[in-house]
Design a protein with these regions (language model features):
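Short, surface-exposed basic-aromatic patches at helix termini and helix-loop junctions that form
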Residues: 3-5, 67-81, 97-102, 127
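Short beta->alpha linker loops
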Residues: 60-64, 87-91, 114
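Glycine-rich phosphate-binding loop used to anchor ATP phosphates in small-molecule kinases
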Residues: 31-84
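Short hydrophobic alpha-helical runs that function as membrane-insertion/retention elements
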Residues: 79-85, 104-109
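Conserved beta-strand scaffold positions in the cores of enzyme catalytic domains, especially
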Residues: 10, 82, 133-135
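Conserved substrate/cofactor phosphate-moiety recognition/catalytic segment
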Residues: 2-52
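Conserved GTP-binding G-domain of TRAFAC-class P-loop NTPases and closely related GTPase folds
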Residues: 94-155
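Conserved nucleotide-binding/hydrolysis micro-motifs of P-loop NTPases
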Residues: 15-18, 86-91, 139-142
Length: 155
């Protein structure tokens, strides 16, 4: 939705995975992780070279990595808008399960446990480095999105 709204290039390794034969409708997601990451980095480099608007989804639970990425975009002349969808771990786990049941994309529940609490802390650590940001929350089904806090003109 954001990429379409802003006519932006979506640079997402999960999207890349879908075109790799070894992905096997989601069952080989972990198998193609490194390959999809490499391909996505090339897509990102091309988008930057073209001056495209970019949507770059990232879990972002390591603030130092997130800030480094934000700095890279700023160094390339980009305005950095940070979006964070806040949700309790049980909701995130439910969405992960739904993603598997509906799309065949398997990710271990440990992905949620590993990031639990860290993503919000990371957002707090880097939000003021962004040109604009938004923290939003929604119902478990994704409806009724609410803005919790924001800075700048982001959406």
């Amino acid at each position: 939705p954001l990429a379409k709204k802003y006519k932006a290039r979506l640079c997402d390794s999960d999207t890349v995975k879908k075109v790799l034969p070894e992905f096997a409708n989601g069952y080989g997601g972990n198998l193609v992780h490194d390959e999809s990451t490499d391909i996505n980095e090339r897509i990102l480099a091309g988008a930057i070279d073209n001056g495209d608007n970019i949507v770059y989804p990232i879990l972002g639970y390591k603030p130092e990595k997130l800030k480094k990425l934000m700095q890279m975009f700023k160094d390339k002349g980009y305005e950095v808008n940070l979006c964070f969808k806040d949700m309790p771990a049980n909701i995130a786990k439910g969405r992960l399960l739904g993603r598997f049941l509906n799309k065949g994309r398997y990710l271990p529940l440990t992905c949620i446990s590993k990031a639990q609490g860290k993503v919000g802390d990371s957002f707090e650590a880097v939000k003021d480095f962004a040109d604009a940001y938004i923290r939003a929350s929604s119902e478990p089904d994704g409806s009724n999105e609410r803005i919790i806090e924001s800075k700048g003109n982001i959406l």
